[in-house]
Amino acid sequence: MEKRIATFEDYSIFKADAECINELSRFIVKENYKHHIGSVKSSQIADDIADVTKEELDLYGDNTYIYIVRDHHEKILGSIRVFLWNRQTELPLEKIYGINPLKAIHSDKKFNYWHVGRFAIDSAAGISTFTLFKRLMALAVQPIVGDNNSYMVAEIDSKLLKVMNALGFVTGN
């Protein structure tokens, strides 16, 4: 189910739940291919969509927040997801880079780790990608900035890291 939380001239932002994960996975995989890879076999895309869907369903919990930008025709234009890590489930950060936040940052139980991911924007939508990024990121970091004992963890490329730093986020790698 999706709940509209903001409306703008050309789009609306929705807070969504696990029911949207399959559609969200299709959008994310296709956008990632457009931005980073280019052309690929449709069978590979289908496999990647299935993998992302499974991973997101495995990670989904009570403290998961999914935000989706849709145009007025219900087409997804952007997305971001944040969840409170339970310290047990393997994070994408661990799977991809072998980095465990408990070893890299703090293991003290007073600290919370929020994973931000599944950020994607359709750059061909005709809407400022920077504006969409700022709006989605502001929603995603709400539970993090409200708690001095919270850390945001994410897998990001150098371009996105520069944007995060320009917005005033203190980052480390």
Question: Where are the language model's segments positioned?
Answer:
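Intrinsically disordered, low-complexity, positively biased terminal segments
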Residues: E2, L59-N63, F83-Q88, G126-I127
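Short, P/G- and charge-enriched loop/turn segments at secondary-structure junctions
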Residues: V52-L57, P101-I105
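Short amphipathic alpha-helix that is part of the acyltransferase structural core
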Residues: E2-E55, G61, I66-I76
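Acyl-donor binding region in acyl/amide transferases
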Residues: L93-G172
